[in-house]
Amino acid sequence: TMNDVLAALSTVEAFVDSGGPILMVIAAVTCVMWTLIFERLWFYKATLRKTINGTITHWNARAEQKSWNAHQIRTAMISRVTEQIRLNLDVIGTLVALCPLFGLLGTVVGMIEVFNVLATSGGADAKSMAGGVKQATIPTMAGMVAAISGVFGSTIVNQIANRESQLLEDQMTMDH
């Protein structure tokens, strides 16, 4: 029902508020990371086979495949397709690595809040200190969860990319 949806949104909003502004950065990085992972999976599923088959057909249509020039053409064709296969994989890896770093930044920001409360209240305001501790731990957890999920996605797309690149190279023989 609508009340359940509103209650869920309220819970998410409370979680985001308790994690501080760094949590929104982690969420944005995670969204970009998973968008790129899904884009790669879509490319591998929908487009890559046509690209590889077209490249192999073009190579096999060549009358001469053994000369040095043919070898250079083959290498260029493989490189062109491999570049398409590996597009954004480095960006995905970088985003995976950034997630826990932003989590640690959230920890630092939260601990600064704890120390500010400690300095102003002399340790008497435990509730405010707990808010700072929460703000310190939630981004760390979110960054780690995002990074762990990203490692799985990144590993899958990298394995597919490596396999498809190797298969392309194996299928473009030089024996005519």
Model-assigned labels for residue ranges:
Residues 160-176:
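Cytoplasmic juxtamembrane regions at transmembrane-helix boundaries
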Residues 1-65, 83-165:
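Hydrophobic alpha-helical transmembrane segments of small proteolipidic membrane proteins, enriched
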Residues 59-69, 173-176:
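Cytosolic juxtamembrane regulatory segments of multi-pass membrane proteins
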Residues 79:
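Residues that scaffold, gate, or flank divalent-cation-dependent active/transport sites
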